[in-house]
Amino acid sequence: MCIRDSSDIYSALKVASAYDFVSELPHGIDTIIGERGVTLSGGQRQRIAIARALLRKPSVLVLDDSTSAVDPKVEAEILQNIKTETNCSLLVIAHRLATIRLAERVIFIDDGKVSASGSHDELLKIDDYANLVSAYEDIKL
């Protein structure tokens, strides 16, 4: 894939909430990252990975715990940006309740099988799902 315009890169960085920290790197988007360059945090690496995926302009974007190292506020911002700024469907695999609550539709998998689907609030009426949510909330206390 050939990117003809750096505006595509900047747009993807903005959607992935990575634009600000990338702009502050010594050489911006041309900064060398890794062992011989600048070291990024786990959350920064995840946001760069999301931006790279968005550059391909996918019709479906699968995020498998792709924001686990990002704080919940930034994660919500990224998911909202993807929803409003792209034309792709988003499939999110998540364990964080804050992420699950943001979803339009949740597919609850229990013992390797689809047990139920619906909104988070709808699924709270199902005992197994409600018990799982309660267990996660108890852990945070």
Ranges and model annotations:
Residues 1-3, 93:
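Short, small-residue-biased leader/transition segments that mark boundaries at the very start
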Residues 55-59:
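A short, proline-enriched helix->beta-strand linker immediately N-terminal to the Walker B motif
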Residues 61-64:
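Catalytic Walker B motif of ABC-type/P-loop ATPase nucleotide-binding domains
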Residues 72-74:
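Helix N-cap at the start of a conserved alpha-helix in ABC-type nucleotide-binding domains
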Residues 81-94, 100:
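Conserved catalytic loops of ABC-family nucleotide-binding domains
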